Amino acid sequence: MTGHPDCPGFDDLPRAHGEVTCRGRIRVSPEDFRVDEILGFEPTGQGEHAFLHIRKTGENTDHVAQRIARLAGVKPMDVGYAGLKDRHAVTTQWFSVRLAGKADPDWRALESESIAVLRHTRHDRKLKRGALAGNRFRIILRGLEGVCDGLEARCAAIRAAGVPNYFGPQRFGHGGRNLQEALRLFADPRRRIDRNKRSLYLSAARSYLFNRVLAGRVEHGSWNRGVEGDAFMFTGSNAFFKTDKLDEDIQRRVEALTIHPSGTLWGRGDPVISGTALAMERVALAQCAEFREGLERCGLEVGRRALRLPVPDLEFAGVEDSACELTFSLPAGTYATTVLRELVEFDPQGWPDT
């Protein structure tokens, strides 16, 4: 991850569970990386929006959405999905298509060697970005080298303590290109740019600042425990609360992984934190005025993100023929790479954009 003199690469970010001693390869084939979307609600079975549950292999989400629009005879904007899925994978995800007053076409016409329609139904609302509970992963690591007999113990440690909730390398584009584009945007905010690209570049800049804050907390040993002045977030929620006193109840809830210290998603407004937490954040971002001021000029509002990512269902299938299998689920907006990097060393630039 490059694009700024002080930008650390993703693999340079500090790990919470010690240095890894095992190296492996990811995505040797699409079948090695499976993602199943967890929608989080059941379609009603009626309404003007058709809902399609699709399995795709080696297919781009936008490309599938365009095929759906052509078959249904609607505009691309009438097709919705909750999030982009990795093209170099076998993934299942839901799509919606607005068919007001129209019958369903024969959805079997979508099917090919790389696309299968698993189910179709109806719902009363369009599927919007981010409207999912999370994703379930099954990942096979191949070509394992080094000292790998500690993987099962590391998985147990992650189940107990979670991992740092870094934004993954996908967020920043190949070679940190999205950060470079963000700096160009900050230098000339009036430059005409596609709305989606603008959002992508601003998100990359804000994610970079968050990763710096989190890296400082990992080095300090407080990414998974509270410090004075912290704001805490609830598991599975964006809600947070501020406390000036770290009493036994707060620490017990942190240890139980029901609440987590949080970091600032930079923008205009009060970051909420104070004291030690605020001082640590200021140190982490002292050299980042260009990003901080640019995000504020572009109108982003301040937000918060948990510093810790729980992975309570992480399972490990033992090493065999220099390969192993990992299964786990993550909430929306988090990254499988943040889990994998605590287990094995791999090339983050080999991870495709999503």
Swiss-Prot record:
Superkingdom, natural source: Bacteria
Active site: 86 (nucleophile)
CDD domains referenced in this protein's UniProt entry, alphabetically: PseudoU_synth_EcTruD
Record-linked SUPFAM superfamilies: Pseudouridine synthase
Enzyme class: isomerase
Entry's Gene Ontology molecular function annotations: RNA binding; tRNA pseudouridine(13) synthase activity
Annotated catalysed reactions: uridine(13) in tRNA = pseudouridine(13) in tRNA
Pfam families: TruD (PF01142)
Keyword vocabulary terms for this entry: Isomerase, tRNA processing
Listed EC numbers: 5.4.99.27
TM stretches of this protein: none
GO biological process, alphabetically ordered: tRNA pseudouridine synthesis
GO CC terms in record: cytosol
Record-annotated TRUD domain positions: 162-309
HAMAP family reported for this sequence: TruD
Family membership noted in the UniProt record: Belongs to the pseudouridine synthase TruD family.
Function of the molecule: Responsible for synthesis of pseudouridine from uracil-13 in transfer RNAs.
Record protein name field: tRNA pseudouridine synthase D
Species annotation: Methylococcus capsulatus (strain ATCC 33009 / NCIMB 11132 / Bath)
